Amino acid sequence: MYATSKKNINLALFDFDGTLCKKDSFTGFIFYALSKRHIVKQGLKILPWIQAYYLNIYPANSMRPKLYRAMFSGADTSEIQQLAKEYAQHLMSQLDPQLYQQLLDHQEQGDDVVLVSASIDIYLQLICDLLNIDLICTGTEIIHHQFTGNYSTPDCSSEQKKYRILERYNIDKY
């Protein structure tokens, strides 16, 4: 999504999951980075919420932090970050070709390009570094080289996306 500007520079905002990337990258990262045994063991602990989510009675913005905490709480950052590098490279090959070209066109025109996503920074920051674009997403908390299982920012979905965009960018500039 972008708005054409009369001031010669545009703010081009791209969503990730289901848009620039055709799949759910967060769930994909869980299966990429963690053992099946760990996923099953931790998944059983939050099974009622998973079921409620799939029955559309528990919202995604509540499910994501619960799932993140169950899967990554106490995980070693160096191990997960190495897997995130590999996963980011994998996702780069999965980008929607037409939208990726739009992104490149915006960069070529000198526009400010931003990825705005409810997914987590662990792998999205690496993707944005590779694409040389800015990132607004859900941050993850690290203490003593371990993921705490908590977010360092609110879940970046719905109204939070709008709030975070307006917080970081002066829309009058575009």
Which ranges hold each PLM region?
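C-terminal cap/substrate-recognition subdomain and adjoining C-terminal extension
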Residues: M1-A3, I9, Q89-Y174
